[in-house]
Every structure is written in C-alpha cells, then in structure tokens.
C-alpha cells in the first residue's frame, strides 16, 4: 500500500509551525507567544542566549534549605520572563499574571508550564523520512 500525502495535510502542518501559542489570562485578555520562525534573527539569538542562563543555576541538593530553593525558583522566573519579553505580544500582562502567585516554587512551575507549552507547540520537529 502506498502513502498518499495531500497538500491540505502539508498546509496544516506548515501553518501550525507559524501559529502563535495563545495563553488566556482572563475572559478578555489573551497573550500570543510567537514561534521562533516568526521572530527576527536577533530575537531568535536572544532567546537562545536566555536559555543558556539556566546553566548558571546550580543543581539543588536534597538538604538545601527552603530559602535557597525559593531563591533558585525566583531565578528561574527571572530567566523565563526574559524569554517572554522576546516572544510575547503582551509580556508585562503575562508576567504580572504569573507573578500573582506568592509561593516562589509554584510560581516557577507556572512559568515553566507556559514556557514548555510554547516549546512543545512551536517545535520545528524533524523531517519525515521520504517514502521509498
């Protein structure tokens, strides 16, 4: 049996790569997170540089005190906020909504959840093997 590829299927996949990720902050406020393909070269490079900052955060040990864990959590939020300033249409509103969470660990998890959703939804993926 041969595989049949349709232009419509290709179109759908290509459009998905260029579509923004929409994050609803409230009933009337939505923030768009632009995919890397829609960013200019300087902005793309800046996003990559921001992600390199994660290497500067030391690994946590099981016996680290709560204050240190909270400090690292806030560092994670600061790094991800830099990325949001580059990719979001309304970065101040997005960051303000995330910063409403008072617990630094939960806040860091929220930041990471939004970032990971953006990464997952806008990934470029790998080329599919050609049918032989």
From Swiss-Prot:
<comment type="similarity">
    <text>Belongs to the L5likevirus tail assembly protein family.</text>
</comment>
<dbReference type="Pfam" id="PF17388">
    <property type="entry name" value="GP24_25"/>
</dbReference>
<dbReference type="GO" id="GO:0098003">
    <property type="term" value="P:viral tail assembly"/>
</dbReference>
<comment type="subunit">
    <text>Interacts with tail assembly protein Gp25 and tape measure protein.</text>
</comment>
<dbReference type="InterPro" id="IPR020132">
    <property type="entry name" value="Gp24/Gp25"/>
</dbReference>
<dbReference type="GO" id="GO:0075523">
    <property type="term" value="P:viral translational frameshifting"/>
</dbReference>
<comment type="function">
    <text>Promotes tail assembly by creating a scaffold for the tail tube proteins. The tail assembly proteins Gp24 and Gp25 would wrap the linear tape measure protein to create a tail assembly scaffold. It would allow polymerization of tail tube protein during which Gp24 and Gp25 are released and therefore are absent from the mature virion. The tail assembly protein Gp25 is produced by a rare -1 ribosomal frameshift. The ratio Gp24/Gp25 is important for proper tail assembly.</text>
</comment>
<protein>
    <recommendedName>
        <fullName>Tail assembly protein Gp24</fullName>
    </recommendedName>
</protein>
<keyword id="KW-1245">Viral tail assembly</keyword>
<keyword id="KW-1188">Viral release from host cell</keyword>
